[in-house]
UniProtKB/Swiss-Prot annotation:
<protein>
    <recommendedName>
        <fullName>DEAD-box ATP-dependent RNA helicase 58, chloroplastic</fullName>
        <ecNumber>3.6.4.13</ecNumber>
    </recommendedName>
</protein>
<keyword id="KW-0547">Nucleotide-binding</keyword>
<dbReference type="InterPro" id="IPR011545">
    <property type="entry name" value="DEAD/DEAH_box_helicase_dom"/>
</dbReference>
<dbReference type="GO" id="GO:0003723">
    <property type="term" value="F:RNA binding"/>
</dbReference>
<dbReference type="GO" id="GO:0009507">
    <property type="term" value="C:chloroplast"/>
</dbReference>
<dbReference type="InterPro" id="IPR027417">
    <property type="entry name" value="P-loop_NTPase"/>
</dbReference>
<keyword id="KW-0067">ATP-binding</keyword>
<keyword id="KW-0694">RNA-binding</keyword>
<comment type="similarity">
    <text>Belongs to the DEAD box helicase family.</text>
</comment>
<feature type="short sequence motif" description="Q motif">
    <location>
        <begin position="76"/>
        <end position="104"/>
    </location>
</feature>
<feature type="domain" description="Helicase C-terminal">
    <location>
        <begin position="314"/>
        <end position="472"/>
    </location>
</feature>
<dbReference type="Pfam" id="PF00271">
    <property type="entry name" value="Helicase_C"/>
</dbReference>
<feature type="short sequence motif" description="DEAD box">
    <location>
        <begin position="231"/>
        <end position="234"/>
    </location>
</feature>
<dbReference type="GO" id="GO:0003724">
    <property type="term" value="F:RNA helicase activity"/>
</dbReference>
<dbReference type="GO" id="GO:0005524">
    <property type="term" value="F:ATP binding"/>
</dbReference>
<dbReference type="InterPro" id="IPR050547">
    <property type="entry name" value="DEAD_box_RNA_helicases"/>
</dbReference>
<dbReference type="InterPro" id="IPR014001">
    <property type="entry name" value="Helicase_ATP-bd"/>
</dbReference>
Amino acid sequence: MASQLLNVPHLAFFPKISYASVFSTLKPSFFHSTSTRRALKSSPSSRIINLQAVAETSSEIESNSVTETTVPLTLRQICQGFVPEHILHRMEEIGFVFPTDIQREALPTLFTGRDCILHAQTGSGKTLTYLLLIFSLINPQRSSVQAVIVVPTRELGMQVTKVARMLAAKSEIDVKGCTVMALLDGGTLRRHKSWLKAEPPAILVATVASLCHMLEKHIFRIDSVRVLVVDEVDFLFYSSKQVGSVRKLLTSFSSCDKRQTVFASASIPQHKHFVHDCIQQKWTKRDVVHVHVSAIMPMPLCLLHRFVMCEKTNKHQVLLALLESDAPESAIIFVGEQSEKSKKAGNDPSTTLLMEFLKTSYKGSLEILLLEGDMNFNSRAASLTEIRQGGGFLLVSTDIAARGIDLPETTHIFNFDLPQTVTDYLHRAGRAGRKPFSDRKCIVANLITSEERFVLQRYENELMFSCEEMML
């Protein structure tokens, strides 16, 4: 196989020691040594980290430090020598001190220049992982686009841009700042064209359509970018109408041999087949590394899953009863997309009908907001702005809110319509339980008909969770 998971079988003589704990004992200079880089950049035929080469730098390992009680490695220790000091300082100011599992496993590999597929559950820190890689490679003195992050939706793009700008914020240290541009659907492309030509940003966060438009108009080029990230890669390849444009970005507008490519997602169906396609289609280099951090449970343990069986005609009243009994602090109510047949018949979408019902029947204090793909971009942005200004909310949304949007105050997810796939269930549920340092149990409630019970059972089996029936 042309990819590898991060396996280190030769470490059997270190009892109960993981790959990460070995790296936790190394000094930052360890990663700069020629022999170490040779070990980490093992040839495609070896597919495994060459510990014989690593052993050449054994003097770098502190005496008696490889034990079961090794102090956890900090993000600074992992990134020292790669990421600029002012970025590390800002990272710690924001509150990123200790790495998540995906950061601990992926960053040492990313810093060697290898292409990576970051595969870990929602809320696991994939965004910060690839941003730290980008900041390790950016040269602020160079006036060109050096990193491109491709996202499926405007909302996720706004979120990634916000985190990137927080990290890149000017510090007291006398260094030139790193500029970040958001090139997202619905933006003012004329202004972006002028910006790209006059003073190209170092980092560009873009939706597929807007990015391809700029490239086709020759406003700028990405054949010289150092890093290309595709976030929510499974959605862009398997669930969107932009597959052709994504493939073109990866092969026609730039070459995988001239850049470092990073794919990220919580769900990559048939990941072995996907890795094979990455190599065969030349989306990545042949020695791409699939870093799969699989939690014991695919779902966050802080989530409690429930379901209520009801008739379709009674769903509005059942939802209202759940809102009154559960009294969520904030909630997202997921509604299915309107079918083409329903649109042609001139029917109102389910989101509109539900919004009208809630505004007349819900007596609680939460603000009722709407987010769906058919809204104009200004309305969508306004909804998210209202949410982030504080206060509780009831957000009625289609699956546009299921990917990447971070609303930490969300305590409840209501699946008014059951998601169509197990992947959609995973991403919807992952919008709750994201508040840092909170041990609060959050609720995922499903409103289903008796005919849909077997579908929910299949999701339970695949995602290894148990769903309790509620009687109203």
